[in-house]
Amino acid sequence: MSHLALQPGFDFQQAGKEVLEIEREGLAELDQYINQHFTLACEKMFNCTGKVVVMGMGKSGHIGRKMAATFASTGTSSFFVHPGEAAHGDLGMVTPQDVVIAISNSGESSEIAALIPVLKRLHVPLICITGRPESSMARAADVHLCVKVPKEACPLGLAPTSSTTATLVMGDALAVALLKARGFTAEDFALSHPGGALGRKLLLRVSDIMHTGDEIPHVNKHATLRDALLEITRKNLGMTVICDESMKIDGIFTDGDLRRMFDMGGDMRQLGIAEVMTPGGIRVRPGILAVDALNLMQSRHITSVLVADGDQLLGVLHMHDLLRAGVV
């Protein structure tokens, strides 16, 4: 490859905008291919009792991997198989209960062509995504999805650009259509993304991260203010609950309450905690989502809440617990 000096006045931005315009035109063409064949493909995938197995070589393989990942995270169980590996044993992962999606812009991938007779023998439904309706793969498919584009964004017409974008969008169209048909919810999505921010927000409950047992700072209503301050210091949550031996809640006292008392002045040494506590306290139930507890704390401008069943104290949740859990 020759390495020439940059042409004077070459406009990178204009070159980039030309790519966007060409690919936009390609996607506009895609609308006509969301037709009865698309419906048939969706029906086969929806009724599939096994997996949706995606195959593709080269750039089509990269798109296929993304497609399979999108299916899997949106309610359509799916995985990718490399056609070359499939020809050397990995085809054993495919069963008659599965549906195969084979991707090739030309529709003439020799690696996929070698697999089609075996898939037919196994009676595996075959959906082919190509840019050529007259190709051998399109003719062999049970359902053909066309992703033909006017031209590639590559000025040489060689590097897959517009065609791979169209294929990716067709995959997204399949995934989202199936998602809607299944009634797939944000909670369902979170179940397959437990390590992500969305998963934490939609799955993590107060009971998963609250302080319980000896971790709960608490004193009885006959304690002095000094006793309460020692308990706050020991448990390091910036507050203490005032409750009886059965953990029935009387109130709460926080370090914010203490600061406000200093602002008021006066002798605090002989005060009982019952004189200065906030009766009741703001409470949540253990089964609510941690993100809902966060929203409550932010709306009330507080850093901790009591976790309770009625007046019965079950735990304490602090803003720092939400930070550590990645909810904030």
Swiss-Prot record:
SIS domain location: 41-184
Family note: Belongs to the SIS family. GutQ/KpsF subfamily.
Ligand binding (substrate): 75-76, 82, 88, 114-123, 148-150, 275
Keywords for the protein's UniProt record, in alphabetical order: Carbohydrate metabolism, CBS domain, Isomerase, Lipopolysaccharide biosynthesis, Metal-binding, Repeat, Zinc
Self-association state and partner proteins as the record states: Homotetramer.
Site residues, Catalytically relevant: 59, 111, 152, 193
Catalytic activity: D-arabinose 5-phosphate = D-ribulose 5-phosphate
Pathway given in the UniProt record: Carbohydrate biosynthesis; 3-deoxy-D-manno-octulosonate biosynthesis; 3-deoxy-D-manno-octulosonate from D-ribulose 5-phosphate: step 1/3; Bacterial outer membrane biogenesis; lipopolysaccharide biosynthesis
Range of residues in the leader sequence: none
CDD domains in the cross-refs: CBS_pair_SIS_assoc, SIS_Kpsf
EC number: 5.3.1.13
Protein's GO biological process: lipopolysaccharide biosynthetic process
Pfam families associated with the record: CBS, SIS
Function as written in the Swiss-Prot or TrEMBL entry: Involved in the biosynthesis of 3-deoxy-D-manno-octulosonate (KDO), a unique 8-carbon sugar component of lipopolysaccharides (LPSs). Catalyzes the reversible aldol-ketol isomerization between D-ribulose 5-phosphate (Ru5P) and D-arabinose 5-phosphate (A5P).
Domain CBS residue range list: 210-268, 277-328
Binding site for Zn(2+): 82
Protein's recorded name: Arabinose 5-phosphate isomerase KdsD
Cysteines joined through disulfide linkages: none
Gene (name only): kdsD
One of the record's GO molecular function terms: arabinose-5-phosphate isomerase activity
